[in-house]
């Protein structure tokens, strides 16, 4: 028995009951019979004190063992309001739990043994109670006869979580209550339940980014809610969510929290599915390099195979167009880019006129001279109009030929004034129109998706429209104001558009992160320093839907020094690989996450992402051996002395030997794939900074008093009211 206790010994018979019973008998016996057996009062008190201490020690051991055995079946949930979430300026609360050690792996190993399950398995009558509850519920309140009414009363009592009596100031827990519908196996958290405490993660570790894996409906959103609420409350930087599917509940949670903290004026909502409520955002309006505009659009095009040729042409094409627009003082938008691609000839003429008016003082005279009709006699002596030769501009409008003639002649005289972007447009204009159309065939559909209907009003907005009171989203504004944002992309309605818009968000942020890394967030302001950096906390739900381009990879690789902290949420490793189409590329993405959270997952391959990181552990067991032998003697000796050895003398009657030793039953990762795949809902393993393994469980979160989350209609109404107030 003592050896078994040294190996934990929490799954065994209740030996302590005998000790407690013996002490319970001896205490009154000594108290009553002590004087009759010669014990003084002092010795009676000493013996009673010793027995009480012994009984108390054994009772404490018994309570610990029984509590552990009951927790292997179910652990009571814990509840928190959003305003009760604990956090500090340097720590992020990630749940309640404990450091997962070798002893926990040993307890899991033991609890799965069939011969030890009877010590914690619920009694057979509990199953009968559950069957009775089902039978009663099927009657739908119609109980006939005394038996059925008795069954209904029993079902009512057995299904209660706790029992309350009017004369008692406390409730009595129902230890045989129905198990919560969380699935999985409760024993994984029970192994360290007595060590459970609030678990915190240093904010510095968040710069290494984090990823959470978990099946649908196992609690990822609950964890996300607990994290984003802390980021909003802390207010030390940006707090934002990218949500491809647009979860109104999550939007409502963030909106309610912003209102509770008085930060609704700094809350920005971008909703592809609800343009009339959305903030306006032009992802190609803020850039430090001209090529950024073209890159943010062309990167949405496929670059695989022959597609790279079209992508490269589109990039060069849009560099010329964006340069022309900026030179003419026009803001590039998706609308203007599409319009000028479709009317390249018009842009060529406008840009040419703009350049000539700026550099050529004789432009008006030259233009009027070339545009004025001229006549000459043909071979028949007839007067015919003398026009410029079309040359490479064949098929173009005559005004285009004039622009080409004037600019060509001017730049021949003034080669130092040649505009390379205009020359790029000229080269495109001289190309076969059908050839150009083929090269832009994949670009036009993309821009059409981004500029159709009400969608164009929010991603290609008219900033000169003073009647439009919707807020404007920009990374500069959100970072400076330490704002809160929710980006819902409605991918279920239009996945292609959602991907394109999401990628432009990330491309814009990558450029901004590069600027912050070089100049800080206060670039251009008096006293600005490169050390002026604030946290940019991004929570990316359905992460696999946001990584269709290289922008997210760049963000993960290089943005940590700019304050960007990404927490990604996804279901499986295969989702990421399928989206990227390349396992090696997926490994590059996953290699950027220094913090790994693993809830219940659907397959072994995903679970191995964590189990291959953690250390291995030896799980032990007691190896008991016994042997009996006779010494060859027909009759036993009449006596033994201290020199006799019945096992070795050869003349003993018989000999016995019992040996107990500890053996290694298995050498395996401290957590197994099976463990991860059978976690209950709301529980997870976390590997913080790739060196600290903790077992976590998450709360049932409730709205803070006075800041309840409304339904969709309430949220939409309040967002409309906010826009109306701005007018």
Q: Where do the protein language model's features map onto the residues?
A:
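Short, surface-exposed, charged/polar-biased interaction segments
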Residues: 130, 137, 233, 339-343, ...
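Accessory regions of macromolecular translocation/handling assemblies
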Residues: 1-241, 248-264, 327, 374-377, ...
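Short, solvent-exposed helix-helix connector turns and helix-capping sites enriched
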Residues: 39-42, 343, 603
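Short acidic-hydrophobic sequence patches enriched in Asp/Glu that either
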Residues: 47, 69-74, 246, 551, ...
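P-loop NTPase motor domains
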Residues: 190-195, 203-218, 222-564, 676-680, ...
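A broadly conserved detector of short glycine/acidic/proline-rich loop/turn motifs that flank catalytic sites
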Residues: 205, 491, 602-603, 614, ...
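Short conserved micro-motifs at the rims of enzyme active sites and ligand-binding pockets
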Residues: 280-281, 497-499, 551, 579, ...
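Conserved ATP-driven motor cores of ASCE-family P-loop NTPases powering translocation/secretion/packaging/pilus
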Residues: 556-558, 562-688
């Amino acid at each position: 028995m003592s050896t078994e206790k040294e190996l934990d010994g929490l799954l065994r018979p209740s030996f302590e009951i005998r000790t407690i019973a013996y002490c319970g008998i001896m205490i009154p016996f000594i108290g009553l019979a002590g004087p009759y057996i010669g014990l003084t009062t002092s010795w009676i008190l000493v013996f009673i004190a010793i027995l009480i201490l012994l009984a108390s020690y054994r009772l404490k051991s018994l309570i610990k063992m029984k509590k552990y055995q009951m927790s292997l079946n179910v652990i009571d949930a814990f509840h928190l309001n959003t305003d009760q979430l604990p956090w500090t300026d340097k720590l992020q609360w990630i749940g309640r739990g404990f450091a997962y050690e070798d002893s926990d792996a040993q307890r899991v190993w033991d609890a799965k043994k069939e011969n030890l399950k009877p010590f914690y398995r619920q009694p057979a009558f509990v199953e009968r109670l559950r069957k009775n509850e089902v039978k009663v519920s099927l009657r739908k309140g119609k109980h006939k006869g005394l038996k059925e009414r008795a069954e209904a009363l029993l079902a009512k009592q057995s299904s209660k979580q706790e029992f309350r009596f009017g004369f008692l100031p406390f409730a009595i827990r129902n230890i045989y209550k129905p198990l919560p519908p969380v699935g999985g196996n409760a024993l994984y958290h029970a192994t360290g339940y007595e060590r459970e405490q609030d678990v915190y993660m240093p904010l510095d570790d968040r710069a290494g980014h984090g990823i959470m894996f978990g099946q649908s409906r196992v609690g990822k959103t609950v964890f996300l809610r607990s994290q984003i609420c802390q980021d909003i409350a802390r207010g030390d930087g940006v707090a934002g969510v990218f949500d491809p599917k647009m979860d109104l509940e999550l939007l409502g949670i963030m909106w309610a929290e912003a209102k509770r903290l008085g930060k609704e004026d700094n809350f920005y909502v971008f909703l592809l599915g609800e343009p009339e409520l959305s903030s306006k955002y032009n992802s190609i309006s803020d850039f430090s390099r001209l090529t950024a505009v073209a890159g943010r659009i062309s990167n949405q095009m496929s670059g695989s195979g022959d597609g790279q040729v079209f992508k490269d042409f589109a990039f060069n094409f849009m560099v010329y167009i964006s340069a022309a627009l900026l030179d003419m003082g026009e803001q590039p938008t998706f609308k203007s880019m599409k319009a000028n691609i479709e009317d390249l000839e018009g842009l060529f003429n406008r840009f040419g006129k703009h350049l000539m008016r700026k550099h050529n003082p004789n432009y008006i005279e030259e233009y009027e001279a070339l545009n004025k009709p001229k006549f000459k006699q043909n071979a028949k002596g007839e007067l015919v109009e003398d026009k410029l030769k079309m040359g490479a501009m064949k098929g173009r409008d005559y005004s285009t030929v004039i622009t080409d003639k004037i600019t060509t002649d001017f730049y021949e005289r003034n080669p130092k004034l040649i505009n390379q972007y205009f020359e790029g447009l000229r080269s495109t204009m001289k190309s076969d129109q059908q050839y150009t159309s083929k090269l832009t065939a994949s670009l036009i559909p993309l821009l059409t998706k981004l500029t159709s209907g009400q969608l164009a009003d929010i991603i290609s907005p008219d900033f000169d429209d003073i009647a439009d009171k919707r807020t404007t989203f920009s990374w500069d504004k959100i970072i400076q104001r330490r704002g809160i944002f929710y980006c819902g992309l409605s991918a279920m309605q239009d996945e292609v558009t959602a991907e394109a818009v999401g990628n432009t968000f990330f491309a814009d942020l990558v450029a901004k992160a590069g600027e912050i890394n070089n100049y800080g967030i206060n670039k251009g302001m008096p006293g600005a320093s490169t050390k002026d950096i604030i946290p940019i906390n991004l929570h990316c739900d359905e992460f696999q839907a946001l990584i269709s381009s290289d922008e997210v990879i760049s963000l993960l690789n290089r943005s940590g020094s700019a304050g960007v902290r990404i927490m990604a949420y996804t279901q499986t490793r295969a989702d990421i690989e399928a989206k990227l189409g390349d396992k090696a590329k997926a490994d590059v993405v996953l290699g950027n996450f220094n913090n790994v959270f693993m809830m219940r997952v659907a397959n072994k391959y995903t679970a191995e992402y964590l189990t291959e990181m953690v250390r291995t552990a030896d799980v032990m067991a007691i190896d008991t051996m016994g042997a009996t032998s006779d010494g060859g003697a027909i009759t036993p000796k009449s006596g033994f002395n201290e020199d006799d050895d019945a096992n070795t003398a050869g003349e003993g009657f018989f000999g016995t030997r019992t040996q107990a030793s500890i053996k290694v039953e298995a050498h395996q990762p401290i957590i197994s794939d099976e463990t991860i795949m059978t976690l209950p809902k709301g529980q997870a393993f976390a590997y913080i900074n790739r060196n600290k393994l903790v077992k976590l469980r998450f709360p049932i979160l409730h709205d803070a008093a006075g800041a309840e989350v409304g339904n969709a209609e309430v949220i939409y109404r309040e967002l409309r009211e906010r826009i109306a107030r701005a007018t």
